[in-house]
Amino acid sequence: HVITAHEQGAAHAADGYARATGKVGVVLATSGPGATNLVTGIATAYLDSIPMVAITGNVPNSLIGRDSFQEVDITGITMPITKHNFFVKRIEDLADTVRTAFQIAKSGRPGPVLVDIPKDVQNAMYEYTPAPVVEPNPVPPVEESLLDEAAAMIEAAKRPYLYIGGGAITDDAGAEVETLADKIDAPIGCTMMGLSAVPNSNPRFLGMEGMHGHYASSISQNEADLIITAGCRFSDRGTGNTQKYARNAKIIHIDIDASELHKNIPADLGLTGSMKEILSKLCQKVQQQQHPEWMARIEELKAYTAKLEAQ
């Protein structure tokens, strides 16, 4: 394990480890201020869908609710910024709780889970029973009829645009993004969380869009007649004024979390499931497309962007 000078640094280190490896990051902290110092790191992991398990200490069960030294309701504090959290009252429940925490952190849309353990439970003795590794819950497949509808929308489009977020990295779907873009002759833009999913060397890749992004990516998104959005939540950094966002485009929104569909931008079609699987199936369903006028316009925008950046 790695000891840090401050718990906030430990939380961000666990977050960074999870981003770099795809594995669950783990952070441990003492009760009271140690636990509350984790909050910013936990919130970061929650908003960016990063798998993390935070394990905190607390006062003994007998002192809970008495405003004891370094007693903090850390489960209550972190409820809005965790996928789930646990307060372990009995030693008999500890092993299964930790296993479940790791399962929740990696299942579906990843995120942080907190396990709060009172001091008397930490000091208790109990016979450990080995158990199989708990795998993440499987993601249900998308209905074929919805995939067929998406394929029909793609084939009807004249100016398609692929817009990807961090889900492309989480689901290791970069190759599927590139394959679909080639199949439907579309440019690729991304959110900040989607950077590195597609290499900058790909001629279709326009970079990050939005207020902090590239001109070509933002303008082409607003000129598109179909936006295929996958693994992102349409945050305000990318959309700007939602009433004026891509007014001429139909939208297909793909996300593993159904609650993200239609939340910020209404979609003409929402698909809930694995981004990698959905894009792979769409590649099989759509016919090869050619959009020479659209791609010529994309090249114009890329050239103008390069000119702006050179100034």
What residue ranges belong to the model's regions?
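Thiamine diphosphate
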Residues: 1-61, 216-235
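Glycine-rich beta-alpha junction loops
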Residues: 59-60, 117-122, 166-168, 195, ...
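Short internal beta-strands
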Residues: 54-56, 114-116, 185-192, 252-255
